Each structure stands twice: as C-alpha cells, then as structure tokens.
Amino acid sequence: MREKIRLVSSAKTGHFYTTTKNKKEMPNKMEIKKYDPVVRKHVMYKEAKIK
C-alpha cells in the first residue's frame, strides 16, 4: 500500500512537497533534490511524516 509522505526542504525555508511512496519497495527515508521556490534553487528534500 502506498503511504502519503511530506518532503521538507533542507534549506530551512518551511517549504514542502507532498507525495506517496511504497513502503515495501523503499523502506528507507526518501531524499531527493527538488526546486525550492523560496530560495530559487534546487535543494535536498527529506522525508517527514504528515501531521
């Protein structure tokens, strides 16, 4: 089953993306480089739980 997750910017801007991932195929925390419009750069986004 796919689980909803939140990708939080490592630039400490408070910006985040929401997405889903398959926990069986990717048991580790997801890290992906995406665009942060607040700082206008590509930065690392790390997985966090949706509250």
Curated annotation (Swiss-Prot):
SUPFAM superfamilies: Zn-binding ribosomal proteins. GO terms for biological process: translation. The gene is rpmG. InterPro entries: Ribosomal_bL33 (IPR001705), Ribosomal_bL33_CS (IPR018264), Ribosomal_bL33_sf (IPR038584), Ribosomal_zn-bd (IPR011332). It comes from Francisella tularensis subsp. holarctica (strain LVS). GO terms for cellular component: cytosolic large ribosomal subunit. It holds the Pfam family Ribosomal_L33. The lineage of its organism: Bacteria, Pseudomonadati, Pseudomonadota, Gammaproteobacteria, Thiotrichales. This is Large ribosomal subunit protein bL33. Keywords: Ribonucleoprotein, Ribosomal protein. Belongs to the bacterial ribosomal protein bL33 family. GO terms for molecular function: structural constituent of ribosome.
